[in-house]
Amino acid sequence: MKLIKNRVQILRERLNYLEYLYYVKSESKVSDEEYDILLEELRQLEFKYPYLITKSSSTQSISNVCDNSLNRIRHQKPMLSLNSIRDKSQLLLFDKRIKYKLSNHYNINQNLIVYCCELKIDGVALSILYKQGKLVHAATRGDGKIGENVTKNVNAIDSIPKNLKKNNNEILPDLLEIRGEIFISKLSFSKLNQEMLSSGKKVFSNARNAASGSLRQLDPHVTELRSLVFCCYGISYYAGLKQLPNSHWGRLKLCNRWGLSINNYIQIVSGIDPVLEYYNYVRKIRSELEYQIDGIVIKIDNCIYQDQLGCGFRAPNWAVAYKFPAELKLTKLNDVVFKVGRTGLITPIAYINPVVIGNVIIKKVNMHNVNEVKRLNLMIGDTVIVQRSGDVIPKILKIILENRVDNAKFIKIPEFCPSCGSILKVEDNKSSVLRCLAKLTCLAQRKSALKHFASRKAMNIQGMGSRVINQLVDKGLICTPVDFFSLSKEKLLCLDRYGEKSAERLLQSILIAKEITLSAFIYALGIPGVGESVSNKLAYMYRTIENLMNADLQSFLQLKFIGKIAAMNIYSFLHQSDNYNNIQGLIRSNLIFK
């Protein structure tokens, strides 16, 4: 029984972490399929052992995934997710359940349930509240009950009306809560990444992440320049004298008349067979669309039936997302390079002949660990099948062994760090996790740690990007984070293409960065296993950096939001002499904790 409890806890922590990355950080670490498998495993365990169910479980609610840098807004009605299906049999089962549940209350035609079929646009869900036709506020999904306030940014998006249109003496609802999707077109996404690349900034991995990151900008002017588009997909709440149609499609047409954009590919069908025809049709035209989609959404059109079927903890019972299978492409493996990460983790990166999957050019694939190279029996020159899982994460599925060339080269697993030459340690024999233990004496780790420290979510030193940090380290001008605060104009003028104005701007950014929240400072330290969420909680628990540094191991082990390994990592990191001296040096740099 203890093993079952441990597995449930591991699944919950993993799902919460993935939801936080997806909704707040705009990052996708696993494919949709992998996420769904984890969620389904947790659902099955909780079904078998119902006494293990908790309110915070991912099966019962959407995790608390709000960005702390944004204010929060409570939705009028919970903003739920959608259950996903991936094959015809699951669609038929969905239709069968709908008919069974409705037949208990209504005399329905068993063969002619009316469905509204829509494209599943790959973007960010948005809730907008109008009061007497005027936009009051807008919020992201958040945890489903409370979302992030993005009103200022939404006001900068042209496709969202600030005031609803009305014809002659038409009555508008006193309150109207609209739900829809914020997304970016393929063309705008390509242009945005070109601009990011030319300015030396990190590009977005996919259009969904670009839309999410653009919507959450602290500067609305940046959002305005990102060419975001809004598409309304429903009304979640209304109040007042205005009566709305009992048809979902009828309500969408009404929204369109009021000035809200709706999708051009919506179809109303009777029965489940036309739903399959719509699915197959959309798959054929998918590549021709101006924006990314990852499936279709099927909803019961009758709003009375919707109310009768109700909602689960995570998703409505009257709708489902029918996802497309991942796209596959054949290509050639040209090289495997072993990269040293910020914490010393050695990651194999596979470089391939470029292939286009889902309108994204794939040139390299993260292999995660050495075991993947061994499992796939990879050799340089092999023909490989690449999958863009969930249309997000590139992955090498397998090799075509019969296509292996005579001059294919064996991939040598490193014994020494590619950066500093230190002997690598095997941390996990099962997955062959390799790590360099040289820490900041390793040049690659030092650069990565300094980049992390200066990044936007950490110290947020504007202008201190990868190119600048690489030069500062290579020229011996900085070695530890403390060195950022002893930089002078004279030192900065040693950098390539750096003039007086650039140096003065960067020094001003360093000065501004000294005023920081405790949570951002903890995150900036780069403690293994401590991301933004844990940093926020540690800051809340300990209040000051002195309290955190003086805490004993038992104090960390008692924290409910981290496990034993994370607790030991935090304690060890804070009490390692170099780290301790580094933190003390940073405190002496006159940081102001706000």
Swiss-Prot record:
SMART domains: LIGANc (SM00532). It comes from the Bacteria. The lineage of its organism: Bacteria, Pseudomonadati, Pseudomonadota, Gammaproteobacteria, Enterobacterales. Zn(2+) binds at residues 417, 420, 436, 442. DNA ligase that catalyzes the formation of phosphodiester linkages between 5'-phosphoryl and 3'-hydroxyl groups in double-stranded DNA using NAD as a coenzyme and as the energy source for the reaction. It is essential for DNA replication and repair of damaged DNA. One of its GO terms (molecular function) is DNA ligase (NAD+) activity. Keywords: DNA damage, DNA repair, DNA replication, Ligase, Magnesium, Manganese, Metal-binding, NAD, Zinc. The gene is ligA. This is DNA ligase. The active site is at 120 (n6-amp-lysine intermediate). Belongs to the NAD-dependent DNA ligase family. LigA subfamily. PROSITE patterns: DNA_LIGASE_N1. Its EC number is 6.5.1.2. NAD(+) binds at residues 32-36, 81-82, 118, 141, 181, 299, 323. The keyword Manganese applies. GO terms for cellular component: cytosol. It comes from Blochmanniella floridana. Its cofactor is Mg(2+); Mn(2+). It catalyses: NAD(+) + (deoxyribonucleotide)n-3'-hydroxyl + 5'-phospho-(deoxyribonucleotide)m = (deoxyribonucleotide)n+m + AMP + beta-nicotinamide D-nucleotide. GO terms for biological process: DNA repair; DNA replication.
